[in-house]
Amino acid sequence: MKKNEEYIVACIDDTDLNSGVVKIDDMVVFVPNLLIGEKAKIKIVKVNKKYAFGIIIELLKPSINRQELTCEVAKTCGGCQLQHMSYAYQLDYKYKHVKKLFEGIEVKPILGMDNPWYYRNKAQFPVKIKDGKVQMGFYRQHSNDVVTCKECKIQDHVINEVFSFIQKKITLKMAQDLRHVFIRHSSTDEIQVVFIGKNEKNIVSLSDQLKNTFANITSIVFNYNTRNDNVILGDTYKVLYGNDYIIEECLGNKVKLHFKAFFQVNPKQMEVLYSQAIKAANLTGNETCIDMYAGTGTIGMAVSQHAKSVIGVEIVKEAVDNANDNTKMNHLDHCHYVCQDATDFAHDHKEDKIDVIFIDPPRKGMTENGIKDTITMQPDKIVYVSCNPKTLSRDLKIFKEYGYQCEYVQPVDMFCQTIGLECVAKLTKIV
């Protein structure tokens, strides 16, 4: 087999990264976007010792699970890897692959959306100048080239409206000082726009146009970033209009959301996810709970409505200050947050009676030391919320070595049209 050779193939399997699997003379070939059962003409683009990669040249026999692409940049933008699949098939596809990861553990049916479009509450648009024209949109897959577009079909309609307005009004002079434009639209109908770049001088007039056009813009910020790497946000900023935060809402609690703070991008499914986490804890109202990796306190505040007390632990001081502001705003006297390293906190509280620990770590999951810290407090139950099924699977094995087994995993489709998936895992002590 050589590069640029063409073959007629039939897809026999798929991977969790959206590649079809075909075999040519006992050589496995991975073909992006090819569905099981499809027949296609492909071209080989890379050959390794034991496997190769191909691309579809012509689809000869499409699957009944394939749908027409409705997005004008779906083939070039790296955002939506699964848009060619019907939504029902996306759920089946994700469920199949997540079930493989958790052998011997019950995996409950995946919870999807009624409408899997226009759901995201946050967008980051890179800004570049090419051939004397401003480019705004999304990065091409595996590239720093910008794919321009009129709208994004998984972004909230209001975000698309603000994005379209900025595209029409931005000048070359404005764009030369920018790296990104960041737009948020909250479930309370507040809009935040953050310009990221080296100088705000040329952006002030655009800021004025935005606030005069969109009545529900409550925050416009310029974030200074002169770095030469891929980090989006810089350390310093200036408020051009309103506040440096917007008000969000989750399960009845208001959340003061600073533009640097993490918040789930799918508000409807976030409530499904956190409701499943609370359900897994099986709370009676008498429990003492810990919210590890607490961030701005969203999970802990939701839990506090069903528990006796909640302590949130977070190492970032600004996030802790925000979380405590949020508890005051929602009159949650039995929920508070501390700024402390997780190891120190665990050892300070190892003699306390902790009923449930909620964990929501970043994509890389937990370290073994982090897992040891968690079980130092000997909770009756652990509820692990994960945005990466692979690191969750790894961590559940380590928890089992230290005496906690997983009863079940509940997948939630938070990132429709993409390969992303959230999961809630319920762990209990091995008796």
Where are these regions (language model features)?
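Short, aliphatic-rich beta-strand segments
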Residues: 189-198, 254-258
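Rossmann-like S-adenosyl-L-methionine
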Residues: 2-8, 14-18, 172, 201-431
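Terminal RNA-binding accessory module
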Residues: 1-69, 73, 336-337
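Internal alpha/beta scaffold segment
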Residues: 146-179, 185-187, 199-221
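A short, glycine/Asx- and small/polar-enriched loop/turn
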Residues: 117-121, 187-190, 419-422
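Short, acidic/hydrophobic/Gly-rich beta-strand patch recurrent on exposed beta strands
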Residues: 20-25, 137-141, 323
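Extended interfacial segments that mediate partner engagement and assembly in macromolecular machines
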Residues: 57-69, 75-176
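Short, solvent-exposed loop/turn elements at beta->coil junctions and helix N-caps
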Residues: 109-116, 179-184, 410-414
